[in-house]
Structure formats: C-alpha cells, structure tokens
Amino acid sequence: LDYPYIDGLDGFVSELDDFVKDGWGIADHQKSYGGKDHTWTSIEIIPLIVTYGTKKAKQGLRGELNEEYTKRFPIIENIINQITTFDDCLWLAVAKVSPKIGTIKRHSDKGIDKMNAGIQIGKTARIHYCLRSNPEAYFELQDLQGGTNTYHMKQGEYWYMDKRKPHAVHNKGDTSRYHMIFDMKITQTVLDNLII
C-alpha cells in the first residue's frame, strides 16, 4: 500500500523503547507462537480481549484504546489516520523482534475475531506498518499452493497481510525489527481511500 512517508520514525521507536522499558511482553493470545526463547515481544495499544465461547472457540473483543501511548506519541494516530481511524481499529500493537535470532513462529490468525478477514466492506484487514527494520529481517507468507513468499518490508511502508494464511517473521540482522500491526474494519471510506 503506497502512502506518504511519515518523518520521525527512528526517534519514535527510540522514545517508545525508553518509555516501555521492561514492559514489552507477549499477550496471552500470542504465546503459542512466541517460541521457547521468546525472541519477540509486543505492546498492545488497543488490546484484543480473548474470550471463549461455549464450544471453547476463541473470540476476540476490542479492548479500550490505551491513551497513555497515544497522548505521549501523537505519531501513532498520524500513522493510523493515513488509512483508517482508531474507532475502526479492532486491535493495534507494536511488535519488536530481537536481532540475530528473532523469530515469530509460523502461525495463522484465523478465528480470533468473529468477522471474516478480507478486503470487502464489513470484513477486517490486517495491516503491517514498518517502523524500523534491517535488510536481514523478513516476513514469510504461505500461498494457497503451499509455496513460501518472502518479503522485506522497509521503514515507512504499509503492507496488507492475509492473516488467515500461515506466516512467520525472522530477524537475522544486527538491530531489532519494529512493526505497528493493526486489524481494521473495511468500510466504504477505507476502500475509497486505499492507495494500492
């Protein structure tokens, strides 16, 4: 997705890291693909509250916007408002993948929210926004034929990702990889403003 580059990303990432300090963690609904070494962590700005239905099926409910982050870092809203609004975000997080050995194990995110994923009105879309990366950090996405596609996402780029397909992240570089990740409602306004 091609949107204008937002200045100040390196400063934002450094300040966010200083602000969060040891508060980086892994949400309960993400622990199964955290790996035994926990080489990645995240913070949730709009948390996903996972509940279980009568058949033990996972359901995700949108939590409250954590204004502690958005008031301190207005750039977060600037990033979101290029493509959607906080009101239409169902989940918003920043993920940090460690250097050299950082891995988010292969997984798919289907079934967490009750709405179907996709780029149609009434569905939800997963967007990755690259805050900071390096040439040796990459994203793997399985296609329907069983092949693996590798993507090197660059700072300031928005990427749509079909979260229903198996995917993984690897960081073999010397610096941490930071992405802002959000699930958003697809509305007519979003479709009208999509720049692909």
Give the role of each language-model region.
Residues 96-97, 117-137:
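Short, conserved beta-strand element in jelly-roll/cupin
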Residues 126-130, 158-160, 174-192:
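A short hydrophobic beta-strand segment most commonly corresponding to one strand
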Residues 1-87:
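Non-heme Fe(II)/2-oxoglutarate
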Residues 107, 137-139, 161-173, 181:
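Short beta-strand His + acidic residue motifs that chelate non-heme Fe in jelly-roll/DSBH
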Residues 145-169:
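Short terminal or interdomain "cap/linker" segment that borders an active site or interface and mediates
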Residues 130-154:
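A short beta-strand-loop-beta hairpin characteristic of the jelly-roll/cupin
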Residues 86-110:
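A short glycine-rich, His/Asp/Glu-containing loop-to-beta-strand
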Residues 109-119:
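Short, P/G- and charge-enriched loop/turn segments at secondary-structure junctions
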